[in-house]
Amino acid sequence: MVSTKLIGKLFVSRQKEIDRYAKEAEAIQEHVFRKLIQTAAATEWGKKYNYANIRTYTDFQRVHIQQYDDVKGYVDRMRHGEKNILWPGQVVWYAKSSGTTNDKSKFIPVSKDGLRHIHYKGGTDAVALYLRSNPQSNFFSGKGLILGGSHSPNYNLKDSLVGDLSAILIQNINPLVNFIRVPSKEIALLSEFEEKVERIAETTIHENVTNLSGVPSWMLAVIKRILEKTGAKHLNEIWPNLEVFFHGGVCFTPYREQYKQLITSDKMHYMETYNASEGFFGLQSDLNDPAMLLMLDYDVFYEFIPLEEIDNPAPAIIPLADVEIGKNYAMVISTSCGLWRYIIGDTVKFTQKSPYKFVISGRTKHFINAFGEELMVDNAEKGLARACAATGAQVLEYSAAPVFMDANAKCRHQWLIEFSTMPDSLENFRHTLDKALQDINSDYEAKRHKDITLQELEIIVARPNLFHDWLKQKGKLGGQHKVPRLSNNRDYIEEMLKLNI
């Protein structure tokens, strides 16, 4: 306890800097904007868009909005060793990002500046904000289990790597952090996920672990293997000082009850982080508020596209100051990793503006709008939570898609759900979920009216490990890979249904 209180004092000045967000948000973002533009002015990209003469945000709007395919050619040249393309100098690290939404991998540049002023800054701030929220913390009395992916050489260029962002972070981590981190770097960077889980379980059982960091679905696999090996019922029997899980990558709602059952300690906390291959953007600053604080003084300049504009060839794009509370936006970023006005694919919804706090509401491509219902991932998560509460169920994984018209000319949503605990009544679960979605989403309610457009949703129970096997078939176990929750077409769900035998 003493060590945590002493070390915690080192975070006080940073906590005060973060407090400035509430009153100085626009000024902070203006400073970031100018820094990024000035630093990149002499790059090939900066010359193309005449960054040297950009003075205002209005000037900056001449830079076109980018998606990955728009910058892929530049990134490919950078991966072959070319310098001063999107960011000064040579970028040698590339975060491989695909999720499961696209078979083509994306290789996101991760510059030294980006590592320092975005990714590692986010990790440090997570601890700073956690210690403020939990002054009784014993965080530094033990070690942190950080679950990451793997990396491999990039075109055999010296010291150049491509892989999961988490692996790049572990590879380049401050050596001092290795004294308070498990597992070893060798184990953490293993490419075979199932072997990694086994080795982590073997080597961490006798450690004093106080904190966990990783993607909830993959961390769950580690926890379950540790419990299997030890015969323990609860993780706090093995790690009695465990107190916080820093989680990100997927929504935690479907996993919360499982974690509560596996970690029964009343001192256990869960803190959401918004870290992606493209950057680190948000942190839960209050453990009692699910919304995250938008991190304003990293090397990230934010813009937003109203979701209804996302398919417009020339969408309306607004700065942070113009966002409205409760509205869905696609996030657009410019960063010191060389991403410029880049659409990252996530949608966010602000809950307040002083300071700016938000929730991740879904993905620009992960929603169902086949019939005008605009069902977002956050709608789905809330609906499932209600259905689980009403029927005693626990959902492990799920994916949903529209049925456009079956033999009886009926349209509906089809949900493929893997339960860790079955509902006491599947029919009641189905009714409750459908009713909850109508309560949450007025567009879905309108389309469900008298079953005219949409019939009541359908649930198919997935066999155990279906989603694990689907990801494995695609070579996407571990790291930051995830199951697509909602899709506007049937491509993914048809693949999954073929495996559901």
What are these regions (language model features)?
Residues 1-52, 59-66, 74-81, 166-501:
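Active-site glycine/GP-rich loop and adjacent strand/helix microenvironment
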Residues 27, 31-35, 39-94, 105-110, ...:
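Active-site diphosphate/adenylate-binding microenvironment
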Residues 83-84, 103-114, 237, 244, ...:
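Non-catalytic, beta-rich accessory domains that mediate macromolecular interactions or localization
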Residues 95-101:
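Conserved helicase ATPase motor motifs in RecA-like P-loop NTPase domains
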Residues 104, 140-142, 241-242, 268:
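Short coil/turn connectors at secondary-structure junctions
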Residues 122-127, 288:
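Short, basic alpha-helical nucleic acid-contact segments in DNA-binding proteins
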